[in-house]
Amino acid sequence: FTFVCGDIADKDFVDDFFAKEKFDYVVNFAAETHVDRSITGPSIFVLTNIVGTHNLLEAARLNGVKRFHQVSTDEVYGDLGTDSTDLFREDTPIAPNCPYAASKASADLLVKSYFETYQMHVTNSRCSNNYGPYQFPEKLIPYFFRLISEGKPVPVYGDGLNVRDWLYVVDHCR
């Protein structure tokens, strides 16, 4: 495991890093992920989630990476509705309804295109909301914990009927 602070939207950085490190496998966790921020400022989502993923795919292809895994989101499927008994499946059509989901769906399609065009070994996981250690403070669970610990009210989104599925990050990795 190597942690390097860099911007995947910076093609020169990505190209140099891949050429130097000679990876066998790439797991792309990098993403802008906040739905509300994607509505007020979508450009960074396009840059990071689409252009950045393209930079990683191209560097992986040119440097002989054996497998590329894209970490995506169930947001690409859109909404089920509160009274739905349906479930999202791997073959559920994508129907993104916010800039974040559209940027992740676009990245997923790029990943698929690298399999179809270059026969690159790629996989993709579209998980529900992840939680776990080191989660960014703007995310729901750490955000709510902070508010509660400070004695502040916890916001209710919309009419309070939204349903979310949560997956512990270690379970996602399995």
Task: Indicate residue ranges for each PLM-predicted region.
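Substrate-positioning beta->alpha
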Residues: 102, 110, 123-124, 135-146, ...
